[in-house]
Amino acid sequence: MGKRKKIAERVVALMDKPERIRNIGIVAHIDHGKTTLSDNLLAGAGMISMELAGKQLFMDFDPLEQARGITIDAANVSMVHEYEGKEYLINMIDTPGHVDFGGDVTRAMRAVDGAVVVVDAVEGAMPQTETVLRQALREGVRPVLFVNKVDRMINELKVEKKEMAIRLGRVIDNINKLIRSMDEEHYKAGWRLDAANGSVAFGSALYNWAISVPQMKRTGIGFDQVYDYCRSDRMKELSQKCPLYVAVNDMIIRFLPSPLEAQKNRIRVIWKGDWNSPVGKAMTACDPNGPVAFMVTKIKVDPHAGEVATGRLFSGTLVRGMELHISGVPHTNRIQQTGIMMGAERIEVERIPAGNIAAVTGLRDAIVGSTVSSDPNMTPFEIIKHVSEPVMTVAVEAKNMRDLPKLIEVLRQTAKEDPTLQITINEETGEHLMAGMGELHLEIVATRIQRDKGVEIKTSPPIVVYRESVTGKSGPVEGKSPNHHNRFYIEIEPLEPGVIEVLKDGKIDMKMEEVERRKILIEAGMDKEEARNMVNFVGTNMFLNMTKGIQYLRETMELILEGFEEAITAGPICREPVQGIKAKLVDVKLHEDAVHRGPAQVIPAVRQAVQAGILMANPTLLEPMQYVFIQVPQDQMGGAMSEIQGRRGVILSMETEGDMITIKAKMPVAEMFGFAGAIRSATEGRALWSTEFAGFEPIPANMMLDTVRQIRTRKGLKPEMPTPSDYLKA
């Protein structure tokens, strides 16, 4: 502990010097070596012994991570590195590479200004590399590149020196292509990666060595010498001459921006408030004396301290006892402790100034994504957009009935810690549902509930999450209130694909200027008249008021929207969420007396009209899809392809490199159960594979009724698909 305490003192000494701070994330595809790299950097900072680096997996402190050999959470740590005679503070977050935990990567990218992208020299850029790079660039985070496992290329693939240079060059070119296609403006402004200037390092995290061009000039050790060291099994000697932490940390300090530099531009990406307001100016300048602006990116429950909220402080200074406002919460929360993270350990410090990553307790009303400020009127930060959506659900029940109240509380707490997890608690049926990113995600959450929260649970086999939508138009459909005094006429049709994309990307919200919102909708393909009459949207569904001059409508609109929301939260086909529909209110007849047009009259009338309208508009069920990427030797290709095609998969592309083939396919999530074992046996265990969320697509027509029947039976509903008249009973 003495050693850590000393490092903590050096960290605190640098906190007030934002020009000497680097907030960075380490991102990569699964198993490309992020956590092993993190260990090396920590060993270089004196936090763990060099011998244990790569074996200790300091950042994978959860027993589940160590048992599975993967990173599940984003762990953060602060350390000190000396560069050109000055000390620098590096706040580092190690992120997961498995697609099921991509939400952790997205949230970590909000807290950092730079990212070290780790790529396996042998496998090259993989699908998840592309995903994490896109997340970084979307958040205005600058990348540098570490090409890992160079020793594998030399010793396993036995490539010649010339071939090695070509292959390494290809890895850099591929990453540059991705950066250019995603963010050309920054690419041209100097974000292009170039081995010659030192924004790329090469090495082996497992054997603790790395080189970069600036370091080659200092040490005289270049690729030829590295090749010889690896071939003659003298990598231990190489790690003493070219320690990994020097090459990588030097690259971080030279190329990744300090908070002072980064916040000038990043604030405009992640915050849409008034830049000339006191908080806007303070954040742009990273001013420790300005109003507090803190964004929560992670919440973890500490058994002793309670909820610990970790996040990035963009302006102001956090001090114990401070009363702060949380976006969307009417009362203030008081900070109880302020600290920094050292992996699993939280070290308390007196105060934390702007530009740092802080871990605080006392913000009991905060959730991931909350804006915390000393200014009650601060515009909140942009919401954190997750790349994937939940695609699988499990039903959870307590083994002992006496644990039921505790289970409900634990599930609420778990949803707070992990926003990519959707928890629905049906108070009527007593069924608790957890929807997550995949089998592994749900399995890990269930294990943690039992281990950390002490609740014995039973889970059902995973069920796929479906969506409901329409392919045709219907209406006007008349919805009558129970007292027959109010009538609503609603048309239903599919929402334009361009508008759906705009909604998914979060490009519009109801707080925007109407003119700006209308312009974006028209550009996305919406009719001018309809764009003017848009009243609200929920998810990717939109409600329009096409009526003119109807008395009492304005004061009833809130109830109408409530009815619309109820109808699309649980659609008519099988009570699954609705997506991609447009509901148009074309006529209304309202009772003049407000008593006769209250919630009990308006909400069911609108809900039934929307539900019946969906059933009349050629309804369809959408199923979640995944891209599947498989790298396999040519002689095993047949086994892999028949496995894909036998599961309703479609092969999109095939690329050959050497004797390896990369297959890109698209498959329904419903067919992915047991895929890991099947692909292993189909290719004699020689396939490398990964997946990525590919959105929702209509289920084949010949499977629709069967699937609907199964879902309805499982939910305890009448098995037959309902008809419009079921919802329009007089």
UniProtKB/Swiss-Prot annotation:
Compartments it resides in: Cytoplasm
Where mainly found? cytoplasm
As for what it does, the entry says: Catalyzes the GTP-dependent ribosomal translocation step during translation elongation. During this step, the ribosome changes from the pre-translocational (PRE) to the post-translocational (POST) state as the newly formed A-site-bound peptidyl-tRNA and P-site-bound deacylated tRNA move to the P and E sites, respectively. Catalyzes the coordinated movement of the two tRNA molecules, the mRNA and conformational changes in the ribosome.
Which superkingdom, per the lineage? Archaea
Looking up Pfam families in the UniProt record yields: EFG_C, EFG_III, EFG_IV, GTP_EFTU, GTP_EFTU_D2
The name under which this protein is listed is Elongation factor 2
| Homology family | Belongs to the TRAFAC class translation factor GTPase superfamily. Classic translation factor GTPase family. EF-G/EF-2 subfamily.
HAMAP family to which the protein is assigned, alphabetical: EF_G_EF_2_A
Q: State any single GO MF term.
A: GTPase activity
What keywords were assigned to this record? Cytoplasm, Elongation factor, GTP-binding, Nucleotide-binding, Protein biosynthesis
Provide the organism lineage as a comma list: Archaea, Methanobacteriati, Methanobacteriota, Stenosarchaea group, Methanomicrobia
Enumerate the residues binding GTP: 28-35, 94-98, 148-151
Name the SMART domains on file.
Answer: EFG_C, EFG_IV
Residues with PTM Diphthamide: 596
The UniProt record lists the tr-type G domain at: 19-260
One cellular component GO annotation, for this chain's record? Answer: ribonucleoprotein complex
InterPro entries tied to this protein? EFG_II, EFG_III/V, EFG_V-like, EFTu-like_2, G_TR_CS, P-loop_NTPase, Ribosomal_Su5_D2-typ_SF, Ribsml_uS5_D2-typ_fold_subgr
